[in-house]
Amino acid sequence: MKRAGWLLCLLAPLGLQASPASQSATTDTARPSEHTQVPRIATVDWTIAETLLALGVTPLAVGDVSAYRAWVGEPLLPADVVDIGLRAQPNRELLAELKPDRILISPLAAPLAPTLSRIAPVQSIALYDPQTDLWQRLHEATLTIAALVHKTAEANVLLTDLNRDLEQMKQTLPAELPPLLVVQFIDERHVRVFGRHSLFEAVMQRLGLRNAWQGETNAWGFSVASLEQFLSIPEARLVVVDPIPVGVSERLQEPGLWQHLPLVQQAPVLHLPAVWSFGGVLAARRFATLLSEALQKDARGDRQ
């Protein structure tokens, strides 16, 4: 069944929150507050939660808080944010008790809308769409969310500052860097490698960096690749983004394919803390900052 397939998708290790849908859809038209009070927002989507925090708004409730902390890293969720359970199966009774003013979802969570709309107005915000420019889509989504919480001015500042700061970071990077191969481990022999339509590539483009992965990608901008496929990539710098599954780091230290990859032998692998690879503008800033700092430290020979 379609619904079962959707649940399996969300219950996978990443629980991808994005959708290739190109249009935002709502079950209720946004109503402006007479006193412009910030509405109490619940969401099952981490990118929406991240965007709210970037705008200075703490969400009332978020799905799968513990996994958010592992995969998203920053911005940190305040301790008073209520965990409403799995993003694919939020605790509806708890949500009803919280009485949110609005519930925000991505199109992937559309099967939840009929039941969630009995609790509060539900609005779906499209975040990822391979048919449109990702950077523009994320800007539009940020402004849409900002309008709902009366933070349009803050959103405009956030977006302007991001574009300015990325340009400044670009100027600080070492010259003549090799292409980068950005991955997240699935197990000791398979990774997600990020290419076209990914947040990571969108940031790299704005930093003037080349992506070594030119293979096909899915709607969220990654391919699942085996380490053997990297044997055919002659020159690239490996960048590994946390989290790494339990036990994988230890197995990679053992003699095996990883240790014999030319990409691993020719230069130290760059490791970055967790960044939500399907995130919004704040994830874009975090990735840009972490990557540029890692490249600068490496150029100085400082790998501590």
Predicted feature residues:
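N-terminal export leaders
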Residues: 1-7
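A short, structured surface patch at a secondary-structure boundary
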Residues: 40-94, 98
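Binding-cleft/active-site segments that stabilize strongly anionic ligands or cofactors
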Residues: 73-129, 169-271
